[in-house]
Each structure stands twice: as structure tokens, then as C-alpha cells.
Amino acid sequence: MGLSTLEQKLTAMISAPVEALGFELVGLEFIRARVSTLRIYIDSENGITVDDCADVSHQVSAVLDVEDPISVLYNLEISSPGLERPLFTTEHYQRFIGEEVSLVLRIAMQNRRKWLGIIKTVDGEMITVTVDGKDEVFALSNIQKANLVPHF
């Protein structure tokens, strides 16, 4: 998934503090608005608690205050990936082969930006998703947003 330059810079900046606390940095997204939002997703083998989010928020805030990479007003959110886990990296897609995924593309394919299907394969920067029984190939750089689809 193509991260913006700011998102790449933020990821590099906060990876070490998050991992030092014993958590995986799943990914982050910066949502521009009147008051923007920096949403950081963390995970661990034991799951994530509110206290975990508070600890990460404290550490990340300190780094962001010193480095000051964001020039606009924003809110910081720390979250677990949840049931509709976002997928950010090639490794995420690889890990969830066989799972259902919802994709939103940057540039439409076959006049569609939204796709729903099962992750079949990951090959470099391309993924194959089975959609209605037919395999479709997507470039990770063209995926704006990807989330697992939970089944109950």
C-alpha cells in the first residue's frame, strides 16, 4: 500500500519507541481535515488494552513533540487493529492469505474502486484476490485502503 511521504517519515520516527514498549507497529494513517488525525495501530500477542494505548500515546507524543513533523493541528489516536484489521504491508497480505479483504483503490480498475474478495497470493508488490470466483491482480501501490472482513 502506498504510504505518503509524511506517513513514511512518521513510521520511521515512531517504530523504535513502539517496539521498545513490546508492541508491533501495525501501521498508521494521517487523515487530513480541519483538525487532522494521526491514527496509529499497535498489536501484541496478548492483545491491546487501554493502558497499552496510553503508554504508547505518551511515548509517541514525546517523540512527535521533539521532532515536530506535522505542521497542522491534529489529534493523536492509538488503537488496536480491531476486527476489521487494516492491511498496510506486503507481510500483512501474506499473513492473511485465505482471508476475505475489502479494498479501495486509488485508481479504478474495470470502472470500480471498491473490491471484496479472498486474498489468494502475494507476489512482490502484487496481490491476487479471488472476486466472485475470478482472480483479480492488484498493485499494492494502487491500494488506498485494505481491511479484513470479519465473519461471525
Curated annotation (Swiss-Prot):
List UniProt keywords, sorted A-Z: Cytoplasm, Ribosome biogenesis
Localization of this protein? Cytoplasm
GO BP? ribosomal small subunit assembly; translation
Sorted alphabetically, which InterPro entries does this protein's record hold? Ribosome_maturation_RimP, RimP_C, RimP_C_sf, RimP_N, RimP_N_sf
SUPFAM superfamilies per record: YhbC-like, C-terminal domain, YhbC-like, N-terminal domain
Which CDD domains has this protein been placed in? Answer: YlxS_C (cd01734)
Q: Which domain of life is it from?
A: Bacteria
Any one GO CC term of the record: cytosol
Q: Which family does it belong to?
A: Belongs to the RimP family.
Which PANTHER family does the UniProt entry name for this protein?
RIBOSOME MATURATION FACTOR RIMP
Question: What is this protein's function per UniProt?
Answer: Required for maturation of 30S ribosomal subunits.
Stated name of the protein: Ribosome maturation factor RimP
